[in-house]
Amino acid sequence: MTADNTEAPPGPRRSDRTRTAILDAARQRFAAQGFERTTIRAVAADAGIDPSMVMRYYGSKAQLFDAALDIDLCLPDLSATPAEERAEALVRHFLHRWEHEGADDALLLLLRSAVTNDQAARRMREIFAAQVSPALGSAAKDNVGLVSAQLLGLALTRYLLRIPAVVRMTPEEIVAAYTPAVRSILEPQASAPGA
């Protein structure tokens, strides 16, 4: 009879768990209170650690805020998607993230903060320029700003301002309403009169 020496794979290191706990607490705090009213002490209390640990991992409140704003939109590469399907795929992707993934608390934090905080506004521009443009391919790169305006407008009205008419819409109704608008930006020649 042999002893079974298989062990479960190790979990995340304690330092990784601490860093994650701090970042999660910071995102929730910044989302609820904004940059100015959020304190390192409050973030530390929410994370269940000493405030000095927050400073050890992130250095300052501004650096913690910047880390909280580090977002991967997880966009699929749409450059190989047929042109007539890109708009719908993009709308569905963003809608799915906002509807189903807690990670988009960070995206909503960024959107909320970008209105009043220069650092957040800069970060929002960087994220959308660096991630949306490559996902759409070179043909659409000049229109990334307008596509972003459509998608961020949806997030603003549905998830931050919670405008009743937009909140009541089902995801399929939103896809049906937004896809033609995004398509008209991505493929202006296809939506032109007489095209």
Task: Name every feature range the model reports, one short phrase each.
Residues 1-52, 62-63:
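Basic, helix-initiating cap at the start of DNA-binding domains
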Residues 75-108:
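Hydrophobic alpha-helical connector segments
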Residues 94, 107-114, 147-151, 155:
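Short alpha-helical scaffolding segments that buttress acidic/His motifs in well-ordered protein cores
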Residues 121-125, 136-195:
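Hydrophobic/aromatic-rich alpha-helical bundle segments in the mid-to-C-terminal region
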